[in-house]
């Protein structure tokens, strides 16, 4: 009786998932979620959402570029995603003469669609629970360190072996991905098909796609048209292929119908996408560690980098275009780190985590299992032991690896060894390879003088953050040869290195010298940074292995407790395809303040500030607003919708995700979360967490009325 009472108590406490909480595995929907989704308003069968044996909505959702989500919206391979997901490719095609970032881009014919070098979109063909098979392979394997259960190389071999057994064919375009879930208590195999000829079709100007920019980022209310459009191309027989002028638009097996009827408070929605990372199974000590290391370093270091980049980008158009994507990428998680730390304190997440820990420990005691308590104590001890190493590693990563671009100078070891070996054939091959690597380093988006200015600030900041006796070994040179003056060291790098300019590299390669390579300051700096980062990893290796084992046991405990209580479960995000659901809704961020669930074009006009580049409104958009020329995209009361908020459980990687209504029709595109919900990566809060979405009516309004690209709408299935 005592055991039953305890389980009943645990079921009522805060580990219970809220109706809106969860990044659910598609394979679990029918068993775990279908009834709840239908109670909340889902108006189609769960098999229309996902079914392994039939074509369904899953088949119209793509992993876009490996870091975002996209959705197929026409039978000829049109893919809709966010403007910020396509931003790097818009920037790739931009120049001072063709400034697509500022002016936007619209292909009025198929011939005008622009190939995007390096862009892939990936469909998920099959999702297989291979837990039992992997566990059998683990038992057979020789694993003296006991780490194969998380080893990517080992799991890749297991995936290949399983595919051979099941006769799953793979090639350059159809690949396997086997990943651990729930701390490696379960394993799933994903069979994926990637298309590598993807072309840019349309993007609004940044004054629409990035309206509000950094000021509004991670905020609600929002007023940006954060979308861009691409097209998948394939060979003439419909197979994935590398870029070729002979390729044709892909005839897809599934595309999503678009609904223009709009949204209202309380409407059921669901989202499919590829959420990147979250950490819902952390204990409180890990949350504190995250606040004091990763988030602290992002806030401190990126803030300095962004200030310098902003100053340089304001000076001329060329620099602005060169650094637009880098700036946006850095700023995104700079603000995220600030908001997360503020929210973790404001919402008392540490207290909540401590209560949840006590529930699980009590559950373990109630069933006579002390493994969960041992795992908890082990994690606490490990987090304390590794604190300084994590702190230092994050400083190296943020300041020196991400912050200083000259860290990425090409590897010169092959040439140095060839020179020492004195074999001309080896030397010629190494010279040719370094020449090619140099071309990639000196790409059109690299500005050495900007890098010099940023590097001076960040290397000095690293020195202030890390005690002298712990710094990476290049600081011995800085102390000895530059009297500790980091600015002088950076100047010497940019004045003397063979990588100071393309011309300097070419001149060196005419008569390469091993000693000069060995003494080159940029080369030595890059090696020191790499070695310093690796040293922090090596210093934590024992703790990392012990942590992984303890975390696996801890998560197993959570699963067992939820199973005992009949509660649904979901794993942490790991860039695999998931589904989340919730209702459209307003919310109250603070006493006396309410944010409505929607925004309109009126709000864009109210925010306009011609003196602030983040809030410039295009003249054509103002003209359409003043004339109320909204076409069929207006709300019933005549206003033009822009964005809406829904209580789905999103995180980074969900950017570009399709937002479906109860009938599985597209009503919007997810692009962000609200500031009050940034703690959601660690702890979900149903009252405050919202996903910001571009209303599909605004997307089509911009395509049709603003851009005049109505030919694209003719490809789409639109329900009016």
PLM regions and their residue ranges:
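Terminal presequence/propeptide segments associated with secretion/organelle targeting
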Residues: 2, 16-720
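Sec-dependent N-terminal signal peptides
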Residues: 4-13
């Amino acid at each position: 009786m005592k055991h039953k009472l305890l389980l009943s108590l645990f079921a009522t406490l805060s580990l219970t998932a809220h109706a809106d909480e969860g990044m659910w595995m598609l394979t679990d929907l029918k068993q775990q979620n279908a009834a709840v989704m239908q109670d909340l308003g889902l108006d189609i069968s769960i098999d229309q959402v996902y079914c392994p044996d039939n074509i369904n909505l899953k088949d119209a959702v793509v992993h876009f570029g490996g870091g975002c989500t996209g959705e197929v919206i026409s039978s000829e391979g049109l893919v809709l995603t966010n403007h910020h997901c396509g931003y790097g490719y818009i920037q790739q095609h931009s120049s001072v003469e063709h400034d697509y970032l500022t002016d936007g881009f619209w292909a009025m014919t198929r011939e005008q669609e622009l190939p995007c070098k390096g862009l892939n979109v990936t469909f998920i063909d099959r999702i297989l629970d291979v837990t039992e098979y992997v566990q059998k392979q683990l038992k057979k394997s020789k694993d003296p360190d006991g780490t194969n259960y998380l080893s990517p190389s080992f799991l890749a071999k297991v995936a290949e072996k399983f595919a051979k057994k099941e006769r799953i064919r793979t090639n350059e375009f159809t690949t396997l991905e086997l990943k651990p879930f729930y701390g490696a208590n379960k394993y799933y195999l994903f069979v994926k098909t990637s298309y590598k000829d993807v072309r840019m079709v349309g993007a609004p100007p940044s004054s629409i796609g990035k309206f509000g920019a950094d000021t509004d980022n991670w905020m609600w209310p929002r007023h940006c048209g954060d979308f861009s459009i691409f097209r998948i191309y394939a060979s003439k027989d419909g197979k994935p292929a590398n870029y070729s002028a002979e390729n044709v638009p892909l005839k897809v097996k599934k595309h999503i119908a678009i609904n223009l009827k709009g949204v209202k408070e309380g409407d059921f929605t669901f989202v499919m996408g590829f959420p990147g990372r979250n950490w819902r199974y952390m204990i409180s000590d890990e949350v504190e560690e995250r606040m004091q290391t990763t988030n602290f370093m992002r806030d401190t270091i990126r803030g300095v980098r962004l200030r310098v980049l902003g100053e340089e980008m304001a000076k001329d158009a060329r620099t602005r275009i060169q650094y637009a994507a880098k700036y946006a990428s850095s700023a995104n998680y700079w603000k995220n780190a600030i908001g997360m730390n503020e929210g973790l304190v404001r919402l008392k997440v540490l207290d909540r985590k401590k209560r949840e820990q006590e529930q699980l420990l009590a559950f373990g005691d109630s069933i006579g299992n002390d493994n969960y308590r041992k795992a908890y104590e082990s994690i606490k001890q490990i987090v304390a032991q590794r604190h300084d190493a994590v702190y230092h590693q994050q400083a190296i990563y943020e300041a020196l690896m991400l912050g200083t671009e000259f860290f990425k100078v090409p590897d010169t070891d092959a040439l140095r060894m060839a020179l020492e070996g004195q074999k001309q054939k080896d030397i010629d091959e190494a010279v040719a390879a370094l020449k090619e690597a140099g071309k990639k380093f000196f790409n059109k988006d690299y500005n050495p003088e900007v890098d010099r200015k940023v590097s001076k600030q960040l290397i000095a900041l690293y020195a202030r953050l890390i005690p002298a006796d712990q710094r990476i070994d290049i600081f011995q040179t800085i102390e000895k040869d530059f009297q500790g003056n980091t600015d002088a060291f950076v100047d010497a790098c940019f004045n003397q290195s063979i990588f100071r300019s393309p011309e300097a590299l070419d001149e060196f390669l005419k008569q390469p010298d091993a000693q000069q390579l060995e003494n080159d300051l940029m080369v030595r700096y890059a090696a020191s940074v790499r070695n310093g980062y690796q040293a922090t990893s090596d210093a934590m290796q024992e703790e990392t292995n012990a942590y992984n084992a303890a975390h696996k046991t801890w998560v197993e405990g959570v699963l067992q407790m939820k199973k005992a209580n009949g509660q649904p479960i979901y794993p942490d995000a790991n860039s695999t395809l998931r589904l989340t659901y919730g209702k459209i809704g307003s919310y109250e961020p603070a006493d006396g303040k309410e944010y409505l669930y929607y925004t309109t074009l009126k709000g864009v006009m109210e925010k306009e500030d011609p003196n602030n580049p983040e809030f410039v409104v295009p003249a054509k958009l103002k003209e359409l607003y003043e004339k109320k020329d909204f076409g069929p995209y207006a709300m019933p009361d005549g206003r033009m919708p822009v964005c809406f908020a829904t209580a789905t459980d999103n995180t980074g990687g969900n950017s570009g995700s399709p937002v479906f209504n109860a009938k599985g029709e597209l009503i919007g595109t997810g692009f962000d979360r609200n500031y009050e919900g940034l703690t959601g990566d660690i702890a979900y809060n149903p009252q405050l967490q919202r996903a910001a979405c571009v209303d599909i009516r605004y997307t089509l309004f911009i395509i049709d009325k603003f851009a005049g690209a109505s030919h694209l709408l003719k490809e789409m299935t639109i329900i009016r």
